[in-house]
Amino acid sequence: MKPAENSTALLKAQEQELRQAVSFAVELATKAGASAEVAVTKVSGLSVSARLQEIENVEFTNDGALGISVYMGQQKGNASTSDLSESAIKNAVEAALAIAKYTSPDDCTGLADKDLMAFDAPDLELYHAADIDVDKATELALQAEQAALQADERIINSNGASFNSHTGVKVYGNSHGMLQSYLSSRYSLSCSVIGGVEDALENDYEYTISREFDKLQSPIWVGENCAKKVVSRLNPQKLSTREVPVIFLNDVATGIISHFAAAISGGSLYRKSSFLLDHLGKQVLPDWFSISERPHLLRRLASTPFDSEGVRTQDREIVENGILQTYLVTSYSGKKLGMSSTGHAGGIHNWLVKPNLTGGLTALLRQMGTGLLVTDVMGQGVNIVTGDYSRGASGFWVENGEIQYPVAEITIAGQLQDMLKNMLAVADDIEHRSNIQTGSILLDKMKISGN
């Protein structure tokens, strides 16, 4: 039996054991007169990191825990155990039941509705075995770093390169009679190097990630791209304070959309801590703008057959023609808002932002003409309650659709409400490595504070 086949057989055997553990825990809680939900996630993996062509770290992981929530009427108790023996599971259930007796009643607590459960969960092909040993992982990390160090003489140091390989089992069950599980895999290779001269150093990184090992970009691609990004940042200039159009590069643009996701999530809404309160069915983005959620795309990083409450995930239009179609609610926040769960316990699943411009970043730069291309943001200056947005940024100054020079040490500021409404275009240079898949986004105007 090949190593990959062997590890798959072991994982499948482990899956059956974990299913039995979950069933046992649910059964114990039910016998005690409670309703319950139980989740187990077990992850095993290998991480190898290297720096300056020497191995720094080899790490094997094998982590897992069973978490149980019990509901006695309107009272809830939680407990967890990493020991999955029958006696340990019994102790965890008893602990959760004991805690429930002392918690305040909450009429919104409890399992998600039975008719929302994923009793027939689709196989999304999230598990792909690969024969990766320490030697292979080391070779990939070293190759990526070497490619970066050799790409340009201005690259003078390294933060290192690392390869990660992880496989996992997720099992979820509850007293509605739901019991589902799936296997998953994830592989990634990353590199970060430093360029420039003393007192004027810049660093950047590049990575590739996939559920399938053979779909990763090559180590050469990772290393050379990493070096290219660093070199392009060398000798940045500062800008004077001004108000100009701004392009958020695709992997930074995902952040803008994630702030939007936070603002329409049930937790923010029922606490009245969102700048998009009472905006369901209203225009929040330009009329050409649409976001679809597709949780069942095969082999994708953010695909999932059910959320962390066992609710089946399904295709949804989040925004259509700029109009907000849905909030993102769990069973708890849904009850608080008088709505049904949308299957978003645990986050969002494959958001696809529809581009309205072909030709990638080049076409978007041309459309902007003169302005700022943001390639990096830093700091915590985002307030979901008020929509205030103010973050440190770096990127490139653009004139006549052409990049002129790198810029750094600037602050960009605006209101998220305005930033969303003032989007002019989304390019088709889609970032596929995130749960939000969007191209670069052009905004009408933002305030830039510099010198």
Swiss-Prot record:
Alphabetic keyword roster: Cytoplasm, Hydrolase, Metalloprotease, Protease
Xref: PANTHER family: METALLOPROTEASE PMBA (PTHR43421:SF1)
Organism domain of life: Bacteria
Predominant location: cytoplasm
Entries under Gene3D superfamilies matching the protein: PmbA/TldD superfamily
Family: Belongs to the peptidase U62 family.
Subcellular localization(s) per the UniProt record: Cytoplasm
UniProt function note: Probable metalloprotease.
Record carries keyword Protease: yes
Any single Gene Ontology cellular-component annotation: cytosol
GO biological process, one term: proteolysis
Keyword Disulfide bond: no
Example of a GO MF term: metallopeptidase activity
The protein's name: Metalloprotease PmbA homolog
